[in-house]
Curated annotation (Swiss-Prot):
One of its GO terms (biological process) is phosphate-containing compound metabolic process. The keyword Ribosomal protein does not apply. This is Inorganic pyrophosphatase. It comes from the Bacteria. Gene3D superfamilies: Inorganic pyrophosphatase. Substrate binds at residues 30, 44, 56, 142. Its EC number is 3.6.1.1. It catalyses: diphosphate + H2O = 2 phosphate + H(+). Catalyzes the hydrolysis of inorganic pyrophosphate (PPi) forming two phosphate ions. NCBIfam families: PRK01250.1. It comes from Vibrio vulnificus (strain YJ016). Homohexamer. Mg(2+) 1 binds at residues 66, 71, 103. The gene is ppa. Mg(2+) 2 binds at residue 71.
Length: 176
């Protein structure tokens, strides 16, 4: 089955399906799911010896301003396998700019049907401060050793901003 058949979610923007590309704490390898075949490709070996602080993936049938689907970070108690799909709800967004332009990262937690562990997290301010600091630190530095690449973290925004990011990106993809 192609991952293209996975819907964006059950009820956007609050009930998403996130396709995982990179597990939390995995080796510094950037994987990307090929949208046509559904295969997980090695995009590059990261120059900085850093680990993604959360599972990293995307929402199908969305189109961000950078031309890719919406990027999503998913904290979980265990790393998720690349190519797996997890049901989530958004809680915030890390606004960033890189060499290609605006590059927001939505943060979403597992749906309560998967785990009650995240039920108390309703907004980005409910996330542990250490986790937010780790995410910020990672994205400020993960491209530092790659020639011609850079990142500027613009800051955290709330659940409403995350919902808007998802809905705008979904609408953009539908109008494409």
């Amino acid at each position: 089955m192609s991952l293209n058949n996975v819907p964006a979610g059950k009820s956007l923007p609050d009930d998403l399906y996130v396709v995982i590309e990179i597990p939390a704490n995995a080796d510094p390898i950037k994987y990307e799911v090929d949208k046509e075949s559904g295969a997980v490709f090695v995009d590059r070996f990261m120059s900085a010896p850093m680990f993604y602080p959360c599972n990293y993936g995307y929402v199908n049938h969305t189109l961000s301003l950078d031309g890719d689907p919406v990027d999503v970070l998913v904290p979980t108690p265990y790393p998720l396998m690349p190519g797996s799909v997890i049901r989530c709800r958004p809680v915030g967004v890390l606004k960033m700019t890189d060499e290609s332009g605006e590059d927001a990262k939505v943060v979403a937690v597992p749906h309560s049907k998967l785990s009650k562990e995240y039920d108390h997290i309703q907004d980005v301010n409910d996330l542990p401060e250490l986790l937010k600091a780790q995410i910020t630190h990672f994205f400020e530095r993960y491209k530092e050793l790659e020639s011609g690449k850079w990142v500027k973290v613009d800051g955290w925004e709330d659940v409403e901003a995350a919902r808007k990011e998802i809905l705008d990106s979904y609408q953009r993809a539908q109008n494409k």
